[in-house]
Regions:
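N-terminal small-domain helix-loop-helix segment of the aminotransferase-like
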Residues: 2-5, 11-103, 110, 157
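Residue-level signal for pocket-adjacent positions within structured domains
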Residues: 5-8, 63, 142, 149-151
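Long, low-complexity, intrinsically disordered polar/charged segments
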Residues: 1-8, 116-121
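PLP-dependent aminotransferase-like
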Residues: 96, 114-162
Length: 162
């Protein structure tokens, strides 16, 4: 059987959603410790569920939802986002400005691929969700972290950005 090597594009990519940090957390759970696992970004295990209205809408539309949506996303969802933007007095948001996706991971990846050229620097807060750093690196960007300190209510340190 032919052996496949990982791409060198992954050499500088760290993604601790899996790997040694998760392995250590699992070991701690096995030792009887309580570990709050926030590494996947799934709110459901923490008691956050979709509102009943959304669940009912999903159920009533399941028969008509068996294909691909428009590449920008479902029209009614995009319209609702535009209307919400208007309610919040966010100027100049039009339907053509709004894209939806299958979750934030897909959209972060699309944005990084579309906006970063090789060697472009991108400011990313630290601590960060590792997907930001991983996708920026894979897109050819050079990640520059700036500190958000808990003692400062997580506000960024402007001097650190310079």
């Amino acid at each position: 059987m032919r052996k496949f090597e990982k791409s060198s594009k992954l050499d500088n990519v760290l993604y601790d959603v899996r790997g040694p940090v998760v392995d250590e957390a699992n070991r701690m759970v096995e030792d009887g410790m309580e570990v709050l696992k926030l590494n996947i970004g799934n709110p459901y295990p923490f008691g956050f569920s979709a509102p009943q209205e959304v669940i009912l809408d999903m159920l009533s539309n399941i028969r008509t939802s068996q294909g691909y949506s428009d590449s920008k996303g479902i029209f009614s969802a995009r319209k609702a986002i535009m209307q919400y933007s208007q309610l919040k007095h966010i100027p100049n948001v039009t339907m053509s400005d709004i894209y939806t996706g299958n979750g934030v991971s897909e959209l972060i990846n699309l944005c990084m691929q579309a906006l970063l050229d090789n060697g472009d620097e991108i400011l990313i807060p630290a601590p960060d969700y590792p997907l930001w750093t991983a996708t920026a690196t894979l897109a050819g960007g050079k990640v520059v972290h700036y500190i958000c300190d808990e003692q400062s209510d997580w506000y960024p340190d402007i001097e650190d950005m310079r």
